[in-house]
Amino acid sequence: MKSIHVVNKIKTRWFQPHVEKAMRVMPVTVLTGPRQTGKTTLAKAVEPTDAYYTLDDLGILNQALQDPASLTLEQPVIIDEVQRAPRLVLAVKHAVDQHRRAGAFLLTGSTNLLVIKSIADSLAGRAIYLQLPPFCPTEWLGREGNLHPLDRLFDADFELREWPVGQGNWPLWLLRGGFPPALEIPNESDRNLWMGAYVQTYLERDLRQLSEVSSLPDFQRLMVMAAQRTGRLLNQAELARDASLSQPTTHRYLNLLEAGCIMTRLRPFTSNPTTALIKTPRLYWRDCGLASWLAGIRSSDAATARMDAGFWLEQTLFQTLQTWQALDPQSRCLHFWRDRSGREVDFILEKEGRFVALEIKTSKQVNPSDASGIKALRETMKNKKALVRGAVLYGGNEPRHLSHDDLALPWGWMAPEDSEGG
């Protein structure tokens, strides 16, 4: 695997083999994700071609709008921020239909291009779509490739000694997030300035490319209110009221945040249609640093002092869990579970029809009652063997059994104390 250069550090993206495989199979590979996740750097590492165009360049953008076919003549070619010129995708389609060969086009975009109907229709049967998440902590630090410890939880022969242990520092990673430029900034005050600039760029450029928004201040207020509800069930009526927006406008703005790869609505898990379950999704952000900045969290002390610190720990660990899912989206899914009596499990990992239930705790102490939600989930499942195991991820350092079926495992390796600095 080639290494890629991000600012002053060499970083190997776990995602790279998946992009390379896609390019061996299909004529078009579409790589999406939030701005500043490293899509361009990854694309150039996968396909070191001289034919590279970015539609952030006004000259290239004008060429794409006036003569899109001219950008498809030299192949293989990388075209960045392709959502800025949807007609260009039609030219790509024509080029593929004239001479179909694998790996001809690598397109990137800061928008989920599947939601743009004209693009999705044009590339049907010609493209593989991949979504690059921001870095998770262990990927940034170059540790434990491909999140093997999470995969091992699905195996019957998993042993406690395999689970990594180490000092954790979730507020550190909550504030850092996973955008490479932000991760390179060593102090919180400078990082806060960067996050503010990021939001302005998103509002003034990326958002307007996706849809007309009549009031950017209204949209930013909605972002702040949504960030303050990180990890919670989405009550759209309450969110609309607090943001002083209509429900239809709130729904549309949430759709735009999701289409822009900024936020996601985590869907609830159900295995038994007769059980009374909550069907409302939960809100999580693709980048925990952005979410915490929007919510007004400016320091590690402020994060740990919050009454809702548990939700922010969940958001921090979600950074790793979404990476786990993104590495194999066809066979992996991420859910949560909650019934109408309030029993819940924070995250459910699904892999090829089998499940691992995870409960998240900030505490350094854990006891069997902390797994009560996992036990309740197990009781509702028709196929109880499908739930391979449950685990309470907690702030201590000792992996151990809580019961015959459930484990207590430290989350420290997923948000480690970073001895390497920035």
Regions found by a protein language model. Name each.
Residues M1-E20:
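N-terminal pre-Walker A segment at the start of P-loop NTPase domains
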Residues K39-T40:
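Conserved lysine of the Walker
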Residues V28-L31:
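Hydrophobic anchor at the beta1->P-loop junction of P-loop NTPases
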Residues S3, L183-F355:
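Accessory nucleic acid-recognition modules appended to NTPase machines
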Residues K2, N112, S118-Q228, R232:
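Interdomain motor-coupling "hinge/lid" segment immediately C-terminal to the ATP-binding subdomain
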Residues G395-G422:
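Domain-level recognition of nuclease-like catalytic cores that cleave nucleotide substrates
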Residues L90-L113, A120-S122:
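Conserved catalytic/switch belt of AAA+ P-loop NTPases
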